[in-house]
UniProtKB/Swiss-Prot annotation:
The lineage of its organism: Bacteria, Pseudomonadati, Pseudomonadota, Gammaproteobacteria, Thiotrichales. The keyword 4Fe-4S does not apply. GO terms for cellular component: plasma membrane. This is NADH-quinone oxidoreductase subunit C. NCBIfam families: PRK06074.1-1. One of its GO terms (molecular function) is quinone binding. It is a peripheral membrane protein.
């Protein structure tokens, strides 16, 4: 492990103090988790005091069903091999969406002057209406990044100057990168020749599992 990464970890811990929930180094990469109520002030210090002048990315993460495999069941089943094809949410029970630390906002920062990088995570406290402070006032480029996280994950950014959808269609319902959003979606669109316009209708595609999610524990990362 490069000593510079350890030095960076120590410097950030000294600068941010109790704003840090935990910091970790894996594969020579530093990840720092911040308390949500102190995230804006801590991120501001990372830029102004430690020279992280470049915000590379802001993204959302949904940890719903994290670590679960597609065929894992919570009770006995009599559906046999059909579980590998058809949707079995009704049989096995819907996933609990009100889990702690379901959503995370992840920031990737770069210090051009010092040639250092850090990953910062913030977990919103409210999973039903996840919200963190916007960092547009710190890095202007966060504008569209935060709009994308709002659009795809439904994460709210307090203080954002124009928080609206950026990728999905007008009138879109839901947030498509949430784990409980169906892969087939809710509606489909087509051109109706009689009406002379595009119409929206309930989706007709059958929700089924073609490639089950499998988690392998036999391969450990190097480093």
């Amino acid at each position: 492990m490069k000593q510079s990464v350890l030095d960076l970890q120590a410097t950030i811990q000294e600068t941010l103090g109790d704003a840090i929930v935990v910091s970790d180094i894996k594969l020579d990469e530093l990840t720092v988790e911040l308390a949500p109520e102190q995230s804006l002030s801590a991120l501001t210090k990372l830029k102004e005091k430690l020279g992280f002048d470049q915000l590379i990315d802001v993204c959302g993460v949904d940890y719903l069903a994290f670590g679960d495999v597609t065929w894992e069941t919570r009770k006995a089943t009599n559906s046999g091999f059909s579980r590998g094809v058809f949707d079995f949410a009704e049989e096995d029970g819907e996933a609990d969406t009100n889990i702690p630390r379901r959503f995370a906002v992840v920031y990737h920062l770069l210090s051009v002057e010092n040639n250092r990088r850090v990953r910062v995570k913030v977990y919103p406290e409210d999973t039903q209406m996840p919200m963190v402070d916007s960092v547009v006032s710190v890095w202007n480029c966060a504008d569209w990044f935060e709009r994308e996280a709002f659009d795809l994950f439904g994460i709210l950014f307090n203080g954002h100057p124009d928080l609206r959808r950026i990728l999905t269609d007008y009138g879109f319902v839901g947030h498509p990168l949430r784990k409980d959003f169906p892969l087939t979606g809710h509606v489909e669109m087509r051109y109706d020749a009689e009406k002379g316009r595009v119409v929206y209708e309930p989706v007709t595609i059958e929700n089924r599992v073609n490639v089950p999610r499998v988690i392998r524990n036999d391969v450990e990362p190097k480093g």
